[in-house]
Amino acid sequence: MKRVVIIEDETAAAVNLRNMLTTITPDVEIVEVLESIEESVEFFSRDVDADVVFMDIHLADGDSFRIFKSVDINIPIIFTTAYDEYALEAFKVNSIDYLLKPFKVEDLRRALDKLHRLTATERMAQ
């Protein structure tokens, strides 16, 4: 995991996630930080080269599941949210993990380890 997209409308949360990611993976590249459904739909309408998307569920302009109704995202997604009631819905849209805010570096590390295991298994199957 080197190339990351963050969808988060709270600046402090986005900065915190970026800092945690660089602590765990110093060579991580934040491809884009998006703050809204509208920005996200526009961004993912193009060809996106990223390894994982970190996505908050509650954005200022609605819930992020609306993004999936407009564009296909074929990149693994790790949801980062304060709401646990969306977990089942999250796993219907390419989610590999669901981190409840506030989460710790160890939680993020476990999610990234899971991403690495899943992508390694996928590469071996090809």
Model-derived features: where do they sit?
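Extreme N-terminal starter segment of soluble prokaryotic enzymes
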Residues: M1-V4
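Conserved acidic carboxylate
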Residues: E8
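Charged phosphotransfer/docking patches of two-component systems
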Residues: T11-V15, A87
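Charged docking surfaces used in two-component/phosphorelay signaling
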Residues: V15-T23
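Acidic, metal-coordinating helix/loop segments flanking the phosphotransfer/catalytic sites
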Residues: R18, V33-V52
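Charged, amphipathic alpha-helical segments characteristic of ABC-type P-loop ATPases involved
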Residues: T23-I24, A50
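A generic structural motif
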Residues: T25-E32
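CheY-like receiver
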Residues: E42, A50-A125
